[in-house]
């Protein structure tokens, strides 16, 4: 048997090593010029006006919710089929996450489900661009505008995703992730884009102790050695070491996503003859970033359960992922919302499995996964 094929592996090369070396030798290794360059690059990529680099997408979500003054008594609409950090940040601020169902086959939250969940207490809507495909953000944003509710796009899966000809985050507010498995990575990191100047100003303060400027700003422009606290804030800034890696990865984005697309197409062709069900593609015009390739494993249809399939693939030296176990089925949220029923979310949460997908995979690697799936399907 070949060596273990992981579910994901970052595509790092000599360029990233050189970028880190440059920062280490520069004498300025924390937040500085590489952060500024990364923010400018994301404004250029998305077409949005402001970009704020942070230590993680979770940190970005936290301070965005804070800047919108979301707290006790407020409600925030979000799918349950998302990473739990979104629910956690809402809860930690004292607000109530209002979890809604998703489309059964795209796993996208729908405008209809969002609008049905709105109450006088609704303060924000957080749609997820899932697995690298875009949600119907025009329709969702129109709901937000009609009711005067903020829309925060969870774009953690969407670096390189386009919706109706525009990159995700082209307008409004969106949060990207540079976590180790994402389409571009710097190990840990995130970035917020927004067209709201006041929100951008608040986010810059909240990410760095509530100060009006960061350490590099003060050092470079000769400002007062101790800036004044304008509001209580956090330590969510990104180091230039991380930013330099992210910048280098961003240069490679088209190549990295092209390779992801090729592997996804290889899977799609093979799955046409297998009982495992891939996700449907959104009906609206889009470019898929293929952050994840997900199949649904229905035991009656496939002759094997999802958990048994994942274990069998592991025994064959193939890693898989689960994105995600529905938040409302996990202990804290299950006990907090014991009567919540989301049929499409629950059906998928019990069946979804993420296959290996990363740019350094070879055609032979994908063939190995396909052969294993064929064997497990009895073919």
UniProtKB/Swiss-Prot annotation:
Its EC number is 2.6.1.87. GO terms for cellular component: membrane. Its cofactor is pyridoxal 5'-phosphate. GO terms for biological process: lipid A biosynthetic process; lipopolysaccharide biosynthetic process; response to antibiotic. The modification N6-(pyridoxal phosphate)lysine is found at residue 182. It comes from the Bacteria. Keywords: Aminotransferase, Antibiotic resistance, Lipid A biosynthesis, Lipid biosynthesis, Lipid metabolism, Lipopolysaccharide biosynthesis, Pyridoxal phosphate, Transferase. GO terms for molecular function: pyridoxal phosphate binding; UDP-4-amino-4-deoxy-L-arabinose aminotransferase. It is an enzyme of class 2 (transferase). It catalyses: UDP-4-amino-4-deoxy-beta-L-arabinose + 2-oxoglutarate = UDP-beta-L-threo-pentopyranos-4-ulose + L-glutamate. The keyword Transferase applies. The keyword Transmembrane does not apply. Pfam families: DegT_DnrJ_EryC1 (PF01041). Pathway: Nucleotide-sugar biosynthesis; UDP-4-deoxy-4-formamido-beta-L-arabinose biosynthesis; UDP-4-deoxy-4-formamido-beta-L-arabinose from UDP-alpha-D-glucuronate: step 2/3; Bacterial outer membrane biogenesis; lipopolysaccharide biosynthesis. NCBIfam families: PRK11658.1 (NF008658). Belongs to the DegT/DnrJ/EryC1 family. ArnB subfamily. Homodimer. Catalyzes the conversion of UDP-4-keto-arabinose (UDP-Ara4O) to UDP-4-amino-4-deoxy-L-arabinose (UDP-L-Ara4N). The modified arabinose is attached to lipid A and is required for resistance to polymyxin and cationic antimicrobial peptides. This is UDP-4-amino-4-deoxy-L-arabinose--oxoglutarate aminotransferase. The gene is arnB.
